[in-house]
Amino acid sequence: MKHELTDVQAGLRKGRGTRDQIANICWIIEKPREFHKNIYFCFIDYAKAFDCVDHNKLWKILQEMEIPDHLTCLLRNLYAGPEAMVRTGHGTTDWFQIGKGVRQGCILSPCLFNLYAEYIMRNARLDEAQAGIKIAGRNVNNLRYTDDTTLMAESEELKSLLMRMKEESEKVDLKCNVQKTKIMASGPITPWQIDGETM
């Protein structure tokens, strides 16, 4: 799996952690000050990220990423047939099938989510975008730690990155929580409207 994830994803990677991404962001904030440039960050929050992973879409994503069929088959068997019912003040509901969400507490769940998120980023084609920050000759426009995603750019082109990612996320049933998604800018920024909400 490590070959499937880009180096901007630090979640569940040996020798890497949240402090690495925090250090990267701090370094990125300091650098533009030297050159008197503005920098814009968008800290994205997915609404119920792990609960919204659609199983059927996940299997297709794993197939597209060429995860070996025998591993996908094992995962399908692990997720086959889960049912639940809800107890209310008026009794219990009928049993119903669960077709979404990765298993809470399962060691595989963050890995599966990482692959789901990687699929979103690839389809959003952020690696091809001009918006971003030049670091050692390389354009960097996102840093990730499992479900925590930070987009960055030197201009308000950041909005185009966010809209690309939001569009691709919604195709696989992940919704950007606009109320919890935050923008940070070192310079002036005009307020954005996304889904009728001002960011």
What are these model-derived regions, one by one?
Residues 1-199:
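Nucleotidyl polymerases of mobile genetic elements and RNA viruses
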